[in-house]
Amino acid sequence: MNATNHPIRILGLDPGLRKTGWGVVAVEGARLTHVAHGVIAPKDSLPFAERLLVLFDAIAEVIALHAPHEVRVRR
């Protein structure tokens, strides 16, 4: 928990150019609670730069919606 005793939200990302998975959990003490999850899948027909822009915009939207305190990225 953070200093105000509210759950900490963590955004996890499983990156990929074809599909990027994401999930948000809330952590309160030893308790984890699922908040939301999804997959971002830019069209394969898009040029590389446009696929990156789709990923950027979608991840920015997830961050704006769920306001995570931390982000973890899978290697």
Each predicted region: which residue ranges?
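Phosphate- and other anionic-substrate recognition elements at nucleic-acid/protein interfaces
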Residues: M1-R75
